[in-house]
Each structure stands twice: as structure tokens, then as C-alpha cells.
Amino acid sequence: MLDIRLFRNEPDTVKSKIELRGDDPKVVDEILELDEQRRKLISATEEMKARRNKVSEEIALKKRNKENADDVIAEMRTLGDDIKEKDSQLNEIDNKMTGILCRIPNLISDDVPQGESDEDNVEVKKWGTPREFSFEPKAHWDIVEELKMADFDRAAKVSGARFVYLTNEGAQLERALMNYMITKHTTQHGYTEMMVPQLVNADTMYGTGQLPKFEEDLFKVEKEGLYTIPTAEVPLTNFYRNEIIQPGVLPEKFTGQSACFRSEAGSAGRDTRGLIRLHQFDKVEMVRFEQPEDSWNALEEMTTNAEAILEELGLPYRRVILCTGDIGFSASKTYDIEVWLPSYNDYKEISSCSNCTDFQARRANIRFKRDKAAKPELAHTLNGSGLAVGRTFAAIVENYQNEDGTVTIPEALVPFMGGKTQISKPVK
């Protein structure tokens, strides 16, 4: 959520930033109009309360002097009714303002390129060279079924489309990837490992920006009023919701693996085969809490943390800056890391790393103190995939496939695969 002072002091800047996302800037005028009404109501209410205090003193004085106080008692009742009415009006305006403010996205950083869609994202880095095969490479969805690593048909029978059973070495590879990523982030990148709740309440979803605007993308347990998480970013960021982080704690760096659940509303017909776009998938997440002046350097560091996984696995990738028309709701700046997938003959997103500045912290009321005597300030929050496990799985299977149908295990994963160096079709 944006600071109301930005609307008051820099309305044109806010309008231009909103327009860059392709949204209607008239909401700024709506907010300013409501804010003016709100301030007038507060002023009027404060005057009434001051008068009520004075009338209360007059009543007490008249009673002490044994004088008739009926007139001032009547005024007191009228003032009470008027104050109650003003408070009701103020509450209504506050709700209207919050309803609008909570749907306005974060302000985009000045160095984000302008554009309308992912076609306008700007490549800033490329690592590795896509492999040239001496045979016709197969898509990962064919490889995993031939090697008995996955079963899409039985998953569809049990749960519907966009689900998968990982079986045999497929399940082992998924588990190995999660363990490898978490181990690297905790032992080399300085993150604290967390196991997170995978069902969260509405306040939690509101804090990170999923609610109220993106409810259609979520799965909800209606009876309990809980939501399945679309990413571990949600519970990790909300760890400090409604808290003041004490001096000396920041920077705080969390990493955690979780299942992620997404309805994929609006993605019909896209990536319908394989592991790229499922309703349920595993992901290792990185979340950071930073002092405002440190958050931009933290974004660069976190992005290189994600890239280090791909480099050690030997998977070619590129980094792009998301343009103004493609960046997410809560982010001020986002890097996407895209891995090379031979089946697409293209790079596909495998990680998004974002600086959300104080946007989520304001929604979730996450503050910190620089020292014990300091006034609490809003922290900056960052999040990044480190990495999407299923897409890493697909990239390994496709990039490390062999002509005889086997798949070579990247050297970095061998210790996490029990020493296994290759995946072959099971004997039975």
C-alpha cells in the first residue's frame, strides 16, 4: 500500500507511475477527494469534542452551584449524537479510501524500462551456451514418462488437469533439488531455513498483496476461511506482520521450501503439457527484510543467489528486467531469470526476484528500529524464487538428456541423489 502523503505531496508523480502500468490515474483524484473530506470531518469532530469537554465542565459547575443545567445537558446529548454521526461518516470514508488504496500497485522504480508486455522486457545478462544436440532432443514431458519419472494421466484421474505424480527417480530428483537449493542458500548465501504454514488467513494474503485484487488466482478453504499459499513468500513475509523488528536484527534473510497452489486463471491454453504450469508445484523461496537504504543492493545480491543455483547446475539462463507493463502488483522492480528449455527453443521463467520497497511492509505493518531510542520505520521487503523446483527439474531433464534415452545427473546434484549419476528406465 502506498503512503497517503505521496498522494497529497506528489499527486502528479503517482499518476504518472500508475499510467506506466497501464492503469487509470483517476484513482489519485478519488483518493485526494476522500482525503479532503476525511480531514474536514476530523477537524469538525475535534471541534465538537472540544466543545463537549467544555460543556461537561459547565454542567459540573452548575451542579456544584445548584443551578439548573437542563440546557447544557441537552447540548451535551446533541453533541454526543453529532459526534457519533461524524465518527460513522469518518469510518465510511476510511473504508472507501482503504478499499481504493489496497488495489493501487506499488510505484515503479525509475530504472524500470517502459513497455506493455513481456515482449518489452529487457535482457541484461546471459550465462552459458545452449547445448547443440547431435540427435533430435525430446521434450521433458515425453522423457519423464518414458523413464517412469512422472505420471500425468493418473494425476488427472485423481485431481484433474495440471497435476502430476512424480514417481521413482522423478520423486527422488525433485527431493534432491529442494535439498540442494536449501542447503546452498543456508550454507553459502546466509539464509535462515524456515518451514512454513501452507494454509494462511485473509490478513496474511492482504499483507503481501494477493488480496483483495487477485482472489480469483487463489484456492480457498471456504469452511475455515483459509487460503492455500501461492508461494512461500506469503508466510515468510508475514512472519513479522504487526511487529517491530528490534535493533541489530536486519538484514533478515529467510529461505523455505513449500508446495505452491495457483488456479492459473487466465492461462488456459498456455503451457498445457509437462511441468511448466501446474496447479500445485514445489518452490524454494528467498525473502529478505532490509533497511530502506540497503534494499537495492539486496535485490542484486538475492538475484545472484538464485543465478548461482543455475550456474552450479550448468543450466544456461538469462536475466531480464520486467518492463512497466509486466511487473507484479507489489514490486517496484523485478528481475526474471529465465532458463533455456530445448523443447521451447527459448528461455522460460524460473525465478522472479523483486524489491517491494515499503509497499508490503505498510500493508502488513512491518517496522524496525535502528536503535532502542529510535522511532519505528517501515522495513523494505524483497522476495525471490530460489528456484521453482519443477521448472528446474524440466530444465535438467531436457538439457542433460542423452541419445540412448537416459538423463545425466548434474555433478552438483549427485550427492543429493545418493551418488547416482544417471537416470535410466526402470527394469520393471
Swiss-Prot record:
One cellular-component annotation, GO: cytoplasm
InterPro entries associated with the record: aa-tRNA-synt_IIb, aa-tRNA-synth_II, aa-tRNA-synth_II/BPL/LPL, Ser-tRNA-ligase_type_1, Ser-tRNA-synth_1_N, SerRS_1_N_sf, SerRS_core, tRNA-bd_arm
Known EC number: 6.1.1.11
A GO BP annotation: selenocysteine biosynthetic process
PROSITE patterns hit by this protein: AA_TRNA_LIGASE_II
Entries under Pfam families matching the protein: Seryl_tRNA_N, tRNA-synt_2b
Key words of the record: Aminoacyl-tRNA synthetase, ATP-binding, Cytoplasm, Ligase, Nucleotide-binding, Protein biosynthesis
Locations listed in the record: Cytoplasm
Binding residue positions for L-serine: 231-233, 285, 385
Record: residues binding ATP: 262-264, 349-352
Record field: catalytic activity: tRNA(Ser) + L-serine + ATP = L-seryl-tRNA(Ser) + AMP + diphosphate + H(+); tRNA(Sec) + L-serine + ATP = L-seryl-tRNA(Sec) + AMP + diphosphate + H(+)
Pathway: Aminoacyl-tRNA biosynthesis; selenocysteinyl-tRNA(Sec) biosynthesis; L-seryl-tRNA(Sec) from L-serine and tRNA(Sec): step 1/1
Top class in the EC scheme: ligase
A molecular-function term among this protein's GO annotations: ATP binding
UniProt keyword ATP-binding present: yes
SUPFAM superfamilies noted in UniProt: Class II aaRS and biotin synthetases, tRNA-binding arm
Stated family: Belongs to the class-II aminoacyl-tRNA synthetase family. Type-1 seryl-tRNA synthetase subfamily.
Domain notes per entry: Consists of two distinct domains, a catalytic core and a N-terminal extension that is involved in tRNA binding.
Subunit and interaction comment: Homodimer. The tRNA molecule binds across the dimer.
Free-text function comment from the UniProt entry: Catalyzes the attachment of serine to tRNA(Ser). Is also able to aminoacylate tRNA(Sec) with serine, to form the misacylated tRNA L-seryl-tRNA(Sec), which will be further converted into selenocysteinyl-tRNA(Sec).
Protein name: Serine--tRNA ligase
Organism from which the protein derives: Staphylococcus aureus (strain JH9)
